[in-house]
Amino acid sequence: MEKAKLTKNLKLKIKNAQLTKAAGLDKLKQKLAQAGSSETKSSSEKPSTKVPEKIAKEKVVKKKSVVDPGVPTMTEPVSAENSPRRIRAKNHSSFVSEDLNSPQPPVPVDSDASAFSDSAVVEEVDSFVETEQEISVSTPPPPVTEETEVVAKEPPAPKKEPEVVVKKEPPKSVVSIKSNFGPTGKHINHLLAKTFKAPKKEDKPAPKEKTKTTQTKPQQSSDASNDKHHSPTNRTSQPFYRRDVSKKSGSDFRDRAKKDDNPKAFTGRDRYGLNDSSDDDKWRKKRVQKTKKHYEEHAIQRPTHIKVPLPITIKDLAAEMKLKASELIQKMFIHGMTYVVNDVLDNETTVQFIGLEFGCTIDIDSSEQDKLCIESNTVKEEIQETDPSKLITRPPIVAFMGHVDHGKTTLIDSLRKTNVAAVEAGAITQHMGAFCCSTPVGNLTILDTPGHEAFSAMRARGAEVCDIVVLVVAGDEGIKEQTLEAVKHARAANITIVVAINKCDKPNFNADTIYRQLAEIELLPEAWGGTTVTINTSAKTGEGLSELLEMLALQAEVLELKANPSARARGLVIESELHKGLGAVATILVQNGTLHLGEALVFNDCYGKVKTMHNEHNQLMKSASPSIPALITGLSSMPKAGDPFVVVKNEKTAKEIVGARLAGQQKFALQKKRPNFDAMLQNKKILKLIIKADVQGSIEALANSILKITSDKVSAEILANSVGEISESDIRLAAASKAVIIGFHTGIESHAESLIKNLGVKVQLFNIIYHAVDAVKEMMTALLDPIAEEKNLGSAEIKETFKSSQLGTIYGCLVSEGTMTRNQKVRVVRGNEIVWKGNLSSLKRIKEDVKEVKKGFECGILLEGCQHAQVGDILQCYEVIYHPQKL
C-alpha cells in the first residue's frame, strides 16, 4: 500500500513539474536554485558519517537537476580506495533501520525536488532488501559540465574494513544540459520514427557490431511503469552515471515494430480512409505513376521516286509517299477531285499527277499484272506475229442477225437441212447457237443470234466473234428496230455485211422498198451502184440459197482468214449453262490454235480441265481446230457468255492465276450495295425478284429487259440470279426477302415443290421472254395503290328532323336529283362546305325499308354517326370506284 501511494504521489509530482515548466515557472525556480547554492557554499562542512558494517552495497545518491527536475544528475559513487569490507544484509528490518538512522547531507533544492528525491531513495532501499550482492562506497567525483559517454568498469575487489569515513565536500552547482525527457523517461529522439535509407542492391549493408555494454537502470526511476519490465532481481551493482542524451548507448531502441518487407496491399478501404491510420503496419502503397514517353520527332525523309501497282487506294498511296491520307485528300479536293481514304485509284494519270503535286515521281509497277495477264495481245495480233508458213486457212464464222420473226433460224435450217425452228418456244430463238455446216463451197461456222430486243448483248458478242454478218431482212416488213441495232454492232466490229432479203415468195414482197431503206442507213446496194451485197432468198422454197453460199465463200477469200493450229488454243465462250449430271458446261468457239482433251483452261474468274468435248450433234471430239465450236465439261464454275479463254500449262497454274484475280477483285470490290436514296425519298415501291434460267445468256437478257422497265412509282430489284433449276435455297431466300421467283426455260426441283406451298412463295415459269417481261410489269402495277374516284348518284334536301331515343336523329328528305341508294357514301353539304362524310345506314319510305329512292319522292334517312345535320342541308349520295394505276 505504501508503495502504491508513493507511486501515485510520484506521478502527480512529475505532472506538476511538467505543468510548471509549461507555465514558465522554471526561470523562477532557477533563480531560487542559484540563491540556495550560494548559501550552501557559505555553510561549514558536516562531519563524515560512518557506514554500517552490515551494508555491503555501494551507496548511490542521486541529485535532482535544478534546471530540469525530470532529468537525473550524474551519480556520485564512493571511491574504491575507501571501500569497506563486504558484509551481508541479515534481514529486512535491520537493513532499513540502519539506513534510516544514518545521517544524510542536506540537498539545496526546492520542495518539489526534495520530495521527489526522498521518495526515490525510499523506493531504492526497498528494492535492495532481498538482494545479496556486494556493494562499495566511494567518494563522489567532482561534477562535470559536459556529458560524456561512460562505460561501466568492473569494480575492484573490496577490502574488508569495519568502518569507512566519507568526507563530503560542499556540492557545487552542476550545469546540466536540458534534455527533452518525457514522462516515460525516454528521450524525444528515441520516440520519433527513424528513417533508414534502403541500401543499394549491389552494396550489402555491413553487419552491426554488438557492443557488450552493461545497460543499467537508475535506482530512482522516474516512472513506476518501468518496474514492470525491470524486476529488482535483474538490477546490477555497477555504478550508474547520468544518461548521455546526445548519444545512443547499446542497441538501437525503436518505439515501434520493424516494418514488414512485404506490406499489405493497397485496398479500396485505404482509398476512402476507412482503415486505421494510426496502425503503423498499415501504410499506403504509393502508386507507380506511368510516365509519358516522349518520342523525339525525327525529320521524315519523303521519297522522290516510288513505284506502285494499280489499282491502289488513297491510304496505300499515302503510306508509300510517307504522307498522311488527309494531305492527299486535301490536295485532290483543291483540284476538284473528291475522294475518301478507301477510294481506289486506277487511273495512271491521276496517280502521277498526285505525285507531282508533292514532288514525287511515281512509276506504275505492272509486274503483278504481267503474271496474271497470260494473253498480252489479241488473237488477231497473235496471228499476225506468227510465221506465215505455220498458218492455214480456216472456215469463216458467219453470224445471222436481224429482227425477230424475220426468218433467220428457218434460213439456217435450210442451209443445214435441219428443222431447228420447229422446236423453238414461241417460234423465236432465245439462245445463241453455233453450228458447223458443210456446203458445196466449203465448211461454214454459223452463229444463230436472237432477234428479240432483250438479246442485245448476245448480238453484240456474235458480231465481235464472227467474220461475216448476214443481215436478214423480211421483204414484206422492211427494216425494223433490231435490224438497225445489228447494223450498229457490225459496224462497231468492222465486219463485212451481206444483206439477205428473205421471204421473197410472199406476194407483198417489195425489194425496192428494202433498197431505199438500206440506202438511208448508208448501206447502198450493188443494184443501185453501191458495195453492199444483197440477195433475195426464201427459206421455204430454197430460192437464193446457193447464191448466198457463193457470196459467203467469195467474201471469205477476200478476207484471207488464217490461223495457227499448232499454237495454244484461244477463243470465246458462246454460251454456258448448268447441266444436271455434267455440272457447268460451256459452248466455246476456238479462234486460234487447237484445243485437246485434258488441257487446262483459264477464263476470267474460273478455270477448268477439259474432260469431255462434243459437237452440235452430241458426238465426242478429241480436238477442236480453229473456227470449230465445241461443248466442253470439267469447269470449276460457269463462265460468263463472252469471256475469253486460253490454255495454260497445267491445272495448278490455272488455279493460281484465277485465285490471284479473285483476290484482287475482292480487295477493291464494294462490300455493301449503296441504298437507293432516290427511291427512299420518293417513297417508291420495290418489286424484289429472283431469276433462274437455263443458260447465262438468258439471265442476262431477261435481267436487262426487266431493268429497262422505268416508272416513277415502282421499280424492280433483282436480288439474285443463277443458272439451273429452282432449288430449296432459292425458295428460302424468296420467303425471307418477300421476293418473287421468275423461272425462264427451267423447272423446279422435285423436293422443293412442297416447300413452295409451305412458305407461300410466288413462283412463275416462262418459256418466252416477252411473256416474262409482261408478267413483271403486271406485278409492278399491282404494287401500286389504286386511284379512288367518287361518282355522284343523287342528292336530297333535308326538310325535317326527328329525334329517336333508340336510333338517334332521323332526317326527312326530298330527293332533288338522281337516286338515293342505301349502304352508299353520303356527304352533308352546308352552303359550299362539306361538314360530314359517312355511310347511309337506313333508307325508308312510308315506314318501309327500301334500297333506293328516286327523284321527286320523300324518304327518311338515317346517317351512321351523324347528329349535327340541319334543316336545309344537302345530302349527296356517291359511290367510290377504284382504278388501277399505270406505270
UniProtKB/Swiss-Prot annotation:
It is found in: Cytoplasm. Residues 448-451 are annotated as: G3. InterPro entries: EF-G-like_DII, EFTu-like_2, IF2_II, IF2_N, P-loop_NTPase, Small_GTP-bd, T_Tr_GTP-bd_dom, TF_IF2_bacterial-like. Keywords: Cytoplasm, GTP-binding, Initiation factor, Nucleotide-binding, Protein biosynthesis. GO terms for molecular function: GTP binding; GTPase activity; translation initiation factor activity. GTP binds at residues 402-409, 448-452, 502-505. Residues 502-505 are annotated as: G4. It holds the Pfam family GTP_EFTU. Residues 393-562 form the tr-type G domain. CDD domains: IF2_eIF5B (cd01887), IF2_mtIF2_II (cd03702), mtIF2_IVc (cd03692). One of its GO terms (cellular component) is cytosol. Residues 427-431 are annotated as: G2. Residues 31-87, 94-113, 129-285 are annotated as: Disordered. Residues 538-540 are annotated as: G5. Its main location: cytoplasm. Belongs to the TRAFAC class translation factor GTPase superfamily. Classic translation factor GTPase family. IF-2 subfamily. One of the essential components for the initiation of protein synthesis. Protects formylmethionyl-tRNA from spontaneous hydrolysis and promotes its binding to the 30S ribosomal subunits. Also involved in the hydrolysis of GTP during the formation of the 70S ribosomal complex. This is Translation initiation factor IF-2. It comes from Chlamydia caviae (strain ATCC VR-813 / DSM 19441 / 03DC25 / GPIC). The lineage of its organism: Bacteria, Pseudomonadati, Chlamydiota, Chlamydiia, Chlamydiales. The gene is infB.
